[in-house]
């Protein structure tokens, strides 16, 4: 393996030093500027052929200039820390405790970003880029807007990869797909009246009550199907002119996750069924508007099909060989993410897409998030070997 990749202990330590530095660089969604500049500087230091930050704030690095285009993507943004007092170390300290690096983003997903940056640079040093172009992106606002950042990158930079590797945490297990997602808003409409005379109005919350019951029943029904999806009411609110008035509008936010075999069109039918017979109800996609750290406007339409690449697909077979070359053994299993990623965009374009990244995804977003730094090194080895084989 050392002969194949030119891996050295010094290079591995430099990778971990950078990884810990990224954790120390706080990068909440829409606040990734410092992280982008840090990554940009490291790419330049490592000898990337081209490095830039695009209009939405994604940092983009390129090595090679061949016809086959390989893309490694990691998002730079992290969810917020609301409980720093509950962490065993400060959440942006990147301290090592019992061999584990602790900190927000240690799993989700600064290990994958660091490993892919160093892998692309190593591939260039080792002369593995003949006929290939490798892009590494640190993308923005993934935690809110799956894929929107990549859509901007591909369009603005006129890039269409042949292969995309999503470096989300998988505990360094080859991951063949993830669930789909539809996020929808249902509204009910009432008539405001004084709280002392509720019979003169129509309570929008009461209008919503039957719909909520139907949501619960739909989730139970989905659970009876092996490998079925889920639906959850994740937010509820109402509008009222005062606390002594009948609410004139009620709004619920639904998060529907789709497993392979389900589709977005099916969910649209489910939404219609939820409001069937309710004259004062409507539904729509939960479209989200965000502004990136550069001022770029992001519009997110949360409706994505589930996807899964075949075990015998050429990319899967190549990943399996890269795994065996890098680690001296065949992969024991494959994985499937039960959450969404930026893969939704390359998959929708027909790009061969697969997942692989360091860290246990069950620890993502959690208090005391942590990752084994050796797994970050291993991911770098895998990415480098994959570049060689593609």
Task: Briefly describe each language-model feature range.
Residues 1-3, 10, 185-390:
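Metal-dependent amide/peptide-bond hydrolase catalytic core
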Residues 22, 26, 168, 208, ...:
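Residue-level signal for inorganic ion chemistry
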Residues 39, 113-123, 150-153, 208-211, ...:
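Buried hydrophobic packing segments
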Residues 81-97, 161, 176-187, 321-322:
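Acidic-glycine-rich active-site phosphate/pyrophosphate-binding loop
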Residues 109-183:
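Acidic/histidine-rich catalytic neighborhood of metal-dependent amide-processing enzymes
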Residues 70-72, 137, 165, 279, ...:
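Hydrophobic/aromatic beta-strand patches that form the interior of the parallel beta-sheet core
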Residues 1-102, 125-129, 360:
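Acidic/His- and Gly-rich active-site-bordering loop/insert found
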Residues 99-115, 194:
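Glycine/serine-rich anion-binding loops at beta->alpha junctions
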């Amino acid at each position: 393996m050392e002969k194949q990749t030119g891996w050295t202990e010094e290079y591995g330590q430099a990778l971990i030093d950078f990884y810990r530095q990224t954790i120390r660089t706080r990068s909440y969604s829409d606040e990734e500027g410092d992280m982008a500049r840090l990554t940009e500087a490291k790419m330049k230091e490592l000898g990337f052929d081209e490095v830039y930050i695009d209009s939405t704030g994604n940092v983009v690095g390129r090595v090679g200039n061949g016809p086959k285009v390989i893309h490694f993507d990691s998002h730079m943004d992290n969810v917020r820390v609301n409980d720093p007092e509950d962490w065993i170390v400060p959440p942006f300290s990147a301290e090592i405790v019992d061999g584990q690096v602790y900190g927000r983003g240690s799993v989700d997903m600064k290990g994958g970003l660091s490993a892919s940056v160093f892998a692309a640079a190593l591939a260039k040093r080792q002369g593995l880029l003949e006929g290939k172009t490798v892009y590494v992106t640190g993308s923005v606002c993934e935690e809110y807007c799956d894929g929107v950042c990549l859509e901007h990158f591909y369009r603005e930079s006129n890039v269409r990869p042949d292969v995309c590797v999503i470096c989300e945490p998988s505990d360094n297990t080859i991951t063949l797909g993830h669930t789909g997602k539809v996020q929808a808003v249902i509204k009910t409409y009432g008539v405001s009246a004084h709280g002392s005379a509720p019979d003169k109005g129509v309570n929008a919350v009461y209008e919503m009550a039957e719909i909520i019951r139907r949501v619960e029943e739909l989730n139970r029904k989905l659970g009876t199907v092996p490998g079925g999806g889920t639906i959850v009411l994740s937010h509820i609110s109402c509008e009222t002119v005062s606390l002594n008035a009948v609410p004139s509008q009620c709004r619920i936010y639904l998060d529907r996750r789709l497993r392979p075999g389900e589709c977005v069109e099916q969910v649209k039918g489910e939404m219609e069924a939820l409001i069937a017979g309710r004259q004062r109800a409507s539904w729509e996609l939960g479209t989200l508007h965000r502004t990136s750290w550069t001022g770029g406007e992001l519009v997110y339409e949360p409706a994505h099909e589930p996807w899964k690449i075949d075990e015998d697909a050429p990319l899967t077979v190549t990943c399996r060989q890269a795994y065996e070359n890098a680690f001296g053994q065949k992969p024991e299993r494959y994985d499937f993410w039960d959450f969404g990623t930026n893969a939704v965009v390359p998959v929708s374009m027909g790009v061969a897409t697969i997942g692989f990244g360091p860290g246990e995804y069950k620890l993502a977003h959690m208090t005391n998030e942590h990752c084994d730094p050796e797994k970050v090194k291993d991911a770098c080895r895998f990415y480098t070997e994959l570049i060689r084989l593609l």
